[in-house]
Curated annotation (Swiss-Prot):
Keywords: Membrane, Mitochondrion, Mitochondrion inner membrane, Repeat, Transmembrane, Transmembrane helix, Transport. Residues 31-61, 123-150, 221-258 are mitochondrial matrix. GO terms for biological process: mitochondrial L-ornithine transmembrane transport. GO terms for cellular component: mitochondrial inner membrane; mitochondrion. This is Mitochondrial substrate carrier family protein S. Belongs to the mitochondrial carrier (TC 2.A.29) family. InterPro entries: Mitochondrial_Carrier, Mitochondrial_sb/sol_carrier, Mt_carrier_dom_sf. Residues 1-9, 83-101, 173-199, 278-285 are mitochondrial intermembrane. It is found in: Mitochondrion inner membrane. The chain crosses the membrane at residues 10-30, 62-82, 102-122, 151-172, 200-220, 259-277.
Length: 285
């Protein structure tokens, strides 16, 4: 992959990450609160309580943490995906199979996890702060306190489930996206890889890719959220231990707590991300 193409992927990924974040963050706040609540609570009740006690801004709690982090993470993700596709491609005239796209997406997700873990850690800690005394004054204060309590290791609390989610999730994410794109290109008689799709096709492809990403390994994300809001300087509880505890208390339903707002969020957020990504790539030439 040329340096120029890599730079374009990074720039487009950065802008796409911001679009995804602002579109989906309110739903993400509800997701994290449902996942980490000590008592079962409905989506609408959680939404109403947030608006009632914290105002509309409560839905955007923790948004400053992932803003620059997610922009950087999506830049790494798309640049990594582009690089992996080049490594897997036999020659320029042979398109990648969907399976190869899945592998490229999975390994790109592993790289993005390095950026994503501390960003999501801070975001989750801030999102579960509701009314009453606030331990963290903001994103920077939260990160500083985490580093004081646990050092770099503390900042990477939840790293293992994040890698698992990002590897498997991005395999599903990019393979679904590429499958949908190829379907629409065949339907519109646009066989070449460089042929542009219309906006509705990009929205559907990106939205379905996002839904696949969250569905394929959702219980691991629930465990990740639980692990990341747990505090202390000691080692994090294992994914298996957390999943067993959730299952013993709430059954299968507990493993999918917050799934509905996640899926509702995933379609518009990822539709926005891929549409903006493709638009920026087009503008950059």
């Amino acid at each position: 992959m040329s340096t120029e193409r890599g730079l374009k992927d990074s720039i487009a990924g950065t802008v796409a990450g911001a679009a995804c974040l602002f579109t989906g963050h309110p739903f993400d706040t509800i997701r994290v609160r449902l996942q980490t609540s000590n008592t079962p609570i409905g989506i609408m009740e959680c939404f109403r309580n947030t608006i009632k006690y914290e105002g509309f801004s409560g839905l955007y709690k923790g948004v400053t943490s992932p803003l620059f982090g997610m922009m950087f993470e999506t830049a790494v993700l798309f640049a990594g995906y582009g690089q992996m596709k080049v490594l897997l491609q036999k020659d320029e005239n042979t398109p990648l199979t969907v399976g190869q796209c899945a592998i490229a997406g999975g390994f790109a997700g592993v790289g993005a996890s390095v950026v994503l873990t501390p960003v999501e850690l801070v975001k989750c800690r801030l999102q579960v702060q509701t009314t009453g005394p606030q331990k963290y004054k903001g994103s920077l204060d939260c990160l500083v306190q985490i580093l004081k309590e646990g050092g770099i290791r503390g900042a990477y609390r939840g790293f293992t489930p994040t890698i698992a989610r990002e590897f498997v999730g991005n395999m599903a994410f990019f393979s679904t996206y590429e499958t949908c794109k190829r379907y629409f290109k065949n339907k519109e008689n646009k066989p070449n890889d460089d042929d542009e799709l219309n906006l509705p096709a990009l929205i559907i492809s990106g939205g379905l890719g996002g839904m696949a990403y969250w569905t394929v390994l959702y219980p691991v994300d629930v465990a990740k959220s639980k692990i990341q809001i747990s505090e202390g300087a000691g080692p994090s509880p294992s994914i298996v231990k957390v999943l067993k505890e959730i299952y013993s208390k709430e059954g299968v339903k507990g493993l999918f707590r917050g799934y509905t707002p996640t899926i509702i969020r995933s379609f518009p957020a990822n539709a926005a991300m891929f549409s903006v990504y493709e638009l920026v790539i087009k503008l950059l030439g």
